[in-house]
Amino acid sequence: MHIIAISINHRTADVALREKVAFKADAIRESHLDLFETKSILENVILSTCNRTEVYAVADQIHTGRYYIQRFLARKFGLEVDEIKEMSEVFVGDEAVEHIFRVTAGLDSIVLGETQILGQMRDAFFIAQEEGTTGTIFNHLFKQAITFAKRAHHETDIADNAVSVSYAAVELAKKVFGNLKSKHAVIVGAGEMSELSLLNLLGAGIDNITVVNRTKERAQQLAEKHQTQYADLSNLNELLVNADIVISSTSAQNYVITQEMMNNVLDQRRHEPMVLIDIAVPRDIDPAIELDMNVFSYDIDDLKGLVDANLRERQAAADQIAEQIPAEINEHNDWVNMLGVVPVIRALREKAMHIQQDTMDSIDRKLPDLSERERKVISKHTKSIINQMLKDPIKQAKELSNDKNSSEKLELFQNIFDIEAESEYKKSLAKKERKLSARHILGFE
């Protein structure tokens, strides 16, 4: 059995293409089942976010599995197979396992180390589990990847440092005030950067936010969208007097907050702490403003310097996480290799126990007058003999898990001891047949 991952992401396709191959939320469950019905696919998980569409599968053959996944995607989105090939990356075997770990840990995201993808991957796995399209391999692998990502984020704090200008603005305010929940924030502007700043302020727990814009209707639209307040730009002076945090991002060609305005504001504030953050180009806040010791002012260069430093820290944390992935892959492979050995050992033990039980039945027939104590002693000793006889064969079988020719040698092992173990492949195939049979009986063609 082979693990395959096919990824359409921000590196391989622009946003217009990614939109074409995004699964609708109300169709994702049915899509799992549609792929599961496909020839060669034994297990599958589908991940679909705004930045990536990925299919993970356990297939009986690499080439057929890859083709049927690509064909599935092409048919699902009305494209040609060649179009899917052009916009996707394909990972097989250890590379596919590594890719799953990297994606889950946020190492493959546009925003390096972001944590949202972990929840999205977990949800994708849970949906696949609920629909019955995962089995022994993926149930183990995805749990391992999710656990690894959680641990990696906790140990490295990779997501703690701001790597966007709007988020960095809020982080700077936190450094001044600590907890922001009781603070009043004013956002000057109603564009994309202003909305991102608003979202980050809300995320920091601030609910007293006023959006100010030259066009009052745009301020109203943004404020109502996020259930905050709004005001006309003519009220800015009054708002600044009571504001703790001001984030300005307009397209104005002249200063929106002038020295004269701030002189008046500072006189009324009585030296209360205040943070001014200017993320506009050209600048909205006059750099000539004479600030007192309790007013902290930052512009776009200050923020970019912080973002750049944080990006370096994130990259160092990402490198640290990436260094741990090979060990996780080895752990996964060791577990997979043992999958082939465990049924063989189980079959050997079962055969030995049958022999022991047959022996005890024969003794009972030939020596019917044995006391219960005598029977228990004989049973104990026959089991002991069998366990001693099995010790070396079982040890040899376990060592085969690390042998590159383990399949052939395990088959020889079974022939020598005249046993037959059910392989993981046969179990997966049987599970798939049962699932599809039940689905067809219920009328889901």
From Swiss-Prot:
Q: Where does substrate bind?
A: T49, C50, N51, R52, S109, E114, T115, Q116, Q120
* Catalysed reactions, as listed in the record: (S)-4-amino-5-oxopentanoate + tRNA(Glu) + NADP(+) = L-glutamyl-tRNA(Glu) + NADPH + H(+)
Q: What is its EC number?
A: 1.2.1.70
**Protein name per Swiss-Prot or TrEMBL:** Glutamyl-tRNA reductase
Q: Say what the protein does.
A: Catalyzes the NADPH-dependent reduction of glutamyl-tRNA(Glu) to glutamate 1-semialdehyde (GSA).
Q: How does it assemble?
A: Homodimer.
Q: What else is known?
A: During catalysis, the active site Cys acts as a nucleophile attacking the alpha-carbonyl group of tRNA-bound glutamate with the formation of a thioester intermediate between enzyme and glutamate, and the concomitant release of tRNA(Glu). The thioester intermediate is finally reduced by direct hydride transfer from NADPH, to form the product GSA.
**Top-tier EC class:** oxidoreductase
Any idea which positions bind NADP(+)?
G189, A190, G191, E192, M193, S194
Pathway as given in its UniProt record? Porphyrin-containing compound metabolism; protoporphyrin-IX biosynthesis; 5-aminolevulinate from L-glutamyl-tRNA(Glu): step 1/2
SUPFAM superfamilies per record: Glutamyl tRNA-reductase catalytic, N-terminal domain, Glutamyl tRNA-reductase dimerization domain, NAD(P)-binding Rossmann-fold domains
- One MF annotation (Gene Ontology) recorded for this entry: NADP binding
Spell out the residues of the site Important for activity: H99
